[in-house]
């Protein structure tokens, strides 16, 4: 898809959203008159539409939706709850594309990877994760970036900045907000996330902070199999910390997990000044066989 066609597709979605919001603000569009219940119903419909539209637009907009789902100061609660579904709704890309990216990034080093599972453990807006074994016997996961993401991201982020400028000039939606600043910050963060070498450095630093705490396990980086678009980490299975039933069934005390998690965050903030900013439950699994660990 050319840059112009991509921009037109994005603007079509933006203008449709603006038209829907304008329509919903008009009392005469509600049969029998507007009331709180009808307005809330419309909001849920629009939030559902927006979530589906962001999924159709792809990675950069899925990531934007995920960021907005953590901003109740910008969007109503109903919108935030609907957008939160983007955390788990991203479709995977094909295994052949996974293999192509690995070959492009790792070259002959791919020979070290055996038993690469074609089914991803999970898929996200930027990448998906596959379990594998190395020739050494080490169990790992490979985070593989979606193909063609760099060019697409830059196109999308350029349009996002244009949209932000339009929103800022709106008499209602621009009041009390700095949309261009949010677009610039979004651009800075997302472009940095495209380089998995940065994430690898952060992961290694984060692991170093907790080497003296045997209650907390953080996967090590396999540097020789990591690159700009591939990140190789030790495989550490676990249970989502918000899956209370599964924790109890495994003999793990959820309260103990919560206490360890809270203590680790205090240590990150107060002692190290370097902390993990993603509180998604899937990011913080509890090991399935160690009731005192997280």
Residue locations for each model-derived region?
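N-terminal accessory/targeting segments that precede structured cores
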Residues: 1-128, 151-179
């Amino acid at each position: 898809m050319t840059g112009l066609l991509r921009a037109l597709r994005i603007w079509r979605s933006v203008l449709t959203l603006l038209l829907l919001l304008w329509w919903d603000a008009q009392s005469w569009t509600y049969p029998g008159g507007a009331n709180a219940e009808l307005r809330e119903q419309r909001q849920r419909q629009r939030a559902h539409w927006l979530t589906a539209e962001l999924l159709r637009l792809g990675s950069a907009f899925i990531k934007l939706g995920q960021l907005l789902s953590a901003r109740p100061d910008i969007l109503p609660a109903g919108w935030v709850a609907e957008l939160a579904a983007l955390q788990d709704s991203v479709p995977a890309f094909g295994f052949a594309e996974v293999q192509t990216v690995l070959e492009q990034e790792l070259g002959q080093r791919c020979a070290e990877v055996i038993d690469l599972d074609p089914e991803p453990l999970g898929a996200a807006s930027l990448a998906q994760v596959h379990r594998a074994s190395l020739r050494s016997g080490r169990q790992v996961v490979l985070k593989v970036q979606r193909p063609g993401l760099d060019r697409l991201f830059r196109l999308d982020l350029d349009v996002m900045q244009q949209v932000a400028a339009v929103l800022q000039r709106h008499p209602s939606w621009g009041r009390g907000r700095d949309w261009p600043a949010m677009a610039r910050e979004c651009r800075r963060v997302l472009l940095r996330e495209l380089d998995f070498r940065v994430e690898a450095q952060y992961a290694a630093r984060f692991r170093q902070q907790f080497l003296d705490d045997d209650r907390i396990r953080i996967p090590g980086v396999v540097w020789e199999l990591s690159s700009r678009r591939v990140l190789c980490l030790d495989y550490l299975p676990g249970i989502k910390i918000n899956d209370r039933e599964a924790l109890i069934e495994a003999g793990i005390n959820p309260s103990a997990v919560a206490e360890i998690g809270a203590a680790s965050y205090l240590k990150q903030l107060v002692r190290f000044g370097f902390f993990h900013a993603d509180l998604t439950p899937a990011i913080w699994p509890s090991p399935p066989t160690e009731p005192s660990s997280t």
